[in-house]
Amino acid sequence: MQFLTSLAAAASLVSLASARISGIALPQTVKAGDNINAIVVTEGYIQSVQDIAIAFGVAPAASAYPGTLSTLLGSFYLGPEQSNVQNNITEPITIPESLVPGEYVIAASLFSLYGASSSPTVSNYNVTVNVGNETSTTYVRSQFYVGNSNSTVCLGGYTRKI
């Protein structure tokens, strides 16, 4: 009987599962002028998160700087319908026709409210992509980690010492 009670309690927790946005994914190679799907990656989380809006930008990899968007590609309202969802969100963006072949950083900034107290947060994600002759079907995902004694920060495919 106690097993059934525990099972029922666990099942009720699963139904209350929350989610948050944990990164972005974009085609590894993009063609200038193409409309592409930017994937906003989600994951399960321990508390509720209200995602308000996300904006995307692009910069040449050589001049990209963490936490900036550079040339704006688009911004999207997320709101209640796209908050706390455990399936990825797709947003359309257009790669500027003016981009010459080479390596670029596509960045995103996300404004969210965390938990019962609605604590505001801005999260930044980025992915290094190549501008080439055609848009690939292979996607690359942002990464975030803070290094140890080297104080190395890796943000979405490019690394800078701090």
Swiss-Prot record:
Domain of life: Eukaryota
Keyword Signal applies: yes
Organism listed in the record: Colletotrichum orbiculare (strain 104-T / ATCC 96160 / CBS 514.97 / LARS 414 / MAFF 240422)
Consequence recorded when altering Y125A: Specifically reduces the interaction with N.benthamiana SERK3 and its paralogs but not Arabidopsis BAK1
Lineage: Eukaryota, Fungi, Dikarya, Ascomycota, Pezizomycotina
Any matching Pfam family: Nis1
Signal sequence segment: 1-19
Domain notes: The C-terminal region from residues 103 to 132 is important for BAK1/SERK3-binding and the host cell death suppression.
Sites where a glycan is attached: N88, N126, N133, N150
Principal subcellular localization: secreted
Self-association state and partner proteins as the record states: Interacts with the host pattern recognition receptor (PRR)-associated kinases BAK1/SERK3, BKK1/SERK4 and BIK1.
Record family assignment: Belongs to the NIS1 effector family.
GO CC terms in record: extracellular region; host cell cytoplasm
Induction summary: Preferentially expressed in biotrophic invasive hyphae at the post-invasive stage.
Region BAK1/SERK3-binding: start-end pairs: 103-132
Record's protein name: Necrosis-inducing secreted protein 1
Swiss-Prot/TrEMBL keywords: Glycoprotein, Host cytoplasm, Secreted, Signal, Virulence
Protein location: Secreted; Host cytoplasm
InterPro entries, per the entry: Nis1
Functional description taken from the UniProt entry: Secreted effector that induces necrotic lesions in Nicotiana benthamiana. Interacts with the host receptor-like kinases (RLKs) BAK1/SERK3 and BKK1/SERK4, inhibits their kinase activity and suppresses INF1-induced pathogen-associated molecular pattern (PAMP)-triggered immunity (PTI) in N.benthamiana. Also interacts with the host receptor-like cytoplasmic kinase (RLCK) BIK1 and inhibits its kinase activity, thereby inhibiting PAMP-induced ROS generation. In PTI, phosphorylation relaying by RLKs and RLCKs is critical for the initiation of downstream signaling.
